[in-house]
Amino acid sequence: MKKQIDKDYHLHIFHAKQCDPKKCTGKKMARFELARIFDKVQKIPRGSILLDPMAKQALSPADKHEQNITVLDCSWETVEEVFPHLMRLHLQHRALPYLVATNPVNFGRPFKLTSVEAFAAALYILGNKKQAEKILSKFNWGHVFLDMNKEPLEDYSKAKDSNEIIKIQSEYM
């Protein structure tokens, strides 16, 4: 029997240049060559999963087939203005389920994840826990995200589809 090898996903960031560069997790990921940053939406890979907090469908293990994951790195203050501009692109919009942020800016706030937390959550749900741990290891608070959200992440990673993710999420809210 063949041992299943986790595939690494290609991580992409559309950077809206709205955050404090010293606190920007997306820029730090790019410095460590863990993600690619784009400043033009046209450069986002076609068909990529876009982690979109306003998406109608939740990310689930059923999305494993896609190899590209993209986040929009912008201020939470402007997220509702920026995401609609991405609707016309050929991307698969997916929302992350209920998780609690552990970054220093939004610690303890549900859904207010940084780019690295969003990527780590997506990777975990899609079955690549090692890549999730690797990207979080560059942040001194990174391991806390997986520790604090371990139970829901495990449950989400066992769901079969978006509908099941929504049911599981309701147990944690």
Swiss-Prot record:
S-adenosyl-L-methionine binds at residues 25, 72, 96, 115. The keyword Calcium does not apply. Its main location: cytoplasm. Its EC number is 2.5.1.157. Keywords: Cytoplasm, Ribosome biogenesis, rRNA processing, S-adenosyl-L-methionine, Transferase. It is found in: Cytoplasm. One of its GO terms (cellular component) is cytoplasm. It comes from the Archaea. One of its GO terms (molecular function) is 18S rRNA aminocarboxypropyltransferase activity. GO terms for biological process: enzyme-directed rRNA pseudouridine synthesis. Pfam families: Fer4_RLI, Ribo_biogen_C. It catalyses: an N(1)-methylpseudouridine in rRNA + S-adenosyl-L-methionine = N(1)-methyl-N(3)-[(3S)-3-amino-3-carboxypropyl]pseudouridine in rRNA + S-methyl-5'-thioadenosine + H(+). Aminocarboxypropyltransferase that catalyzes the aminocarboxypropyl transfer on pseudouridine corresponding to position 914 in M.jannaschii 16S rRNA. It constitutes the last step in biosynthesis of the hypermodified N1-methyl-N3-(3-amino-3-carboxypropyl) pseudouridine (m1acp3-Psi). Belongs to the TDD superfamily. TSR3 family. This is 16S rRNA aminocarboxypropyltransferase. It comes from Methanococcoides burtonii (strain DSM 6242 / NBRC 107633 / OCM 468 / ACE-M).
